């Protein structure tokens, strides 16, 4: 069961995230503005990093996919330190438990961020557009709604960029990677070369989950995970051979 979970959480889920986050735009907050950009489809523009953006319905669907996939990744990171036990020493155990705490914080705050700035925002934009098309919003009311949404997007506590929620989730992701790597290194269950892509995942994920950092991060996670699995498998085979 754990083998199946490993491949689902650390290979399949990151691969899905790579696929969807290639179409997750960035750098639109200041110009043209959050609502002004997300409210309609956009062709590829290097300024916004994504291969393309398909409109507010895609923003909703993207985050509906992304949220559970990140949950699976969190389970996968937890599985990485699952074998660490009392025989591995106090430092390794301490790092493993701190890693679990960081993974928990990452999962909670990333889910909050996606719920507010992804799923909720996407549906809100669609509802606002529907009300405007039906004539139930005056232009003045519409302008007020747009102002409110743009203001919430940069809110220091729950906004989609640079907020407490966003930064907490991002740094918790980085801390998770660092602490998982530390636990595995201290326990002798992984080497430095194997942990470099895991640390790269944490740093890139801390920087952003939009394109291109998001796809790069999850690509590095796949490399680190497959490498770690292969190393453990080879070690187990070596131990099973007669002396």
Segments predicted by a language model, with ranges:
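Hydrophobic, aromatic-enriched alpha-helical segments typical of multi-pass transmembrane helices
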Residues: 1-243
């Amino acid at each position: 069961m754990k083998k199946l979970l490993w491949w689902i959480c650390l290979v399949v889920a990151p691969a899905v995230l790579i696929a969807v986050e290639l179409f997750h735009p960035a750098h639109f907050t200041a110009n043209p503005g959050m609502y002004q950009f997300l409210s309609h489809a956009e062709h590829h523009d290097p300024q916004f990093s994504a291969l393309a953006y398909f409109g507010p319905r895609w923003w909703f669907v993207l985050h509906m996919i992304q949220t559970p996939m990140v949950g699976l990744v969190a389970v996968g990171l937890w599985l990485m330190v699952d074998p660490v036990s009392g025989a591995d020493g106090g430092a390794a155990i301490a790092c493993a438990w701190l890693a679990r705490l960081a993974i928990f914080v990452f999962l909670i705050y990333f889910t909050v961020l996606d719920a507010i700035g992804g799923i909720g925002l996407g549906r809100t934009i669609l509802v606002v557009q529907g009300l405007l098309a039906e004539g139930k919003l005056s232009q003045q009311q519409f302008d007020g709604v747009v102002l409110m949404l743009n203001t919430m997007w940069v809110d220091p506590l729950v906004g989609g960029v640079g907020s407490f929620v966003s930064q907490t989730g991002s740094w918790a992701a980085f801390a998770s990677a660092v602490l998982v790597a530390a636990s595995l290194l201290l326990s002798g269950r992984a080497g430095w070369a194997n942990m470099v892509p895991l640390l790269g995942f944490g740093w890139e994920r801390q920087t952003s989950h939009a394109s291109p950092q998001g796809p790069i991060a999850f690509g590095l996670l796949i490399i680190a995970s497959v490498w770690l699995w292969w190393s453990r498998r080879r070690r187990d085979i070596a131990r099973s051979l007669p002396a």
